[in-house]
Amino acid sequence: MLGMLGAGAAGVAAAPWLQRGWEGFLGAASQADPTGLTGVLPNPGGFRYYSVVGSVPRKDARTYRLKVNGLVDRPRTYTLDELRALPQKRVVRDVQCTDGWRVADTPFEGVPLSVLLDAAGVRPEGKALHFTCFDGVYRESLTLDQARRPDMLVALKMQDKPVSHEHGGPVRLYAAPMYFYKSAKWLSEITVTDEVIPGYWEEYGYDLDGWLDGEDRRGDAQAA
């Protein structure tokens, strides 16, 4: 019995290490797989890995930058440390993809989009946000009202850890009330525009808003 307990304890202790190893393998495999088929492989954390390109450069605190520009009075470029120093918000929701998989009660933490917009000073003609990613291909969009909801984050943490490269780190978008394709990975630029510019998947027929069923779709502070 003691032997069995010891083996069980060892298994529990090794579980995080095994999960990190499997996640690292899947992340590396997905970058070498232009088909995206590695996204169907199971992962203990519940997430699947997918990228629309074969390889994504890695960024860290030394090399990462986030630009906020467009129809604003005060364009700015943030370092990772500067983002960490801003007010943070924690949001816990189910993450859901359009192909049916779901990860329940997933915590994200980061800077509310509204904080960055207020700091930039959006001009009256600004109506939407266009998000660009440093994979060089992916992009997304939100209306300005959607972006000001308190459950829209520039996420620095996911599942209580810094967002890993495989999950779109060091910084990604988290659009809590929407399907996960709206939560762009590897975020590098936020541009305020005068109209909504369709994102990557919207050009293939996905819904422009991507609301989850049952979500309050108001674009105001009471929506979350």
Locations of regions flagged by a protein language model:
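N-terminal export signals
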Residues: M1-R20
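Structured, non-membrane catalytic/scaffold regions adjacent to prosthetic-group chemistry
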Residues: P16-A224
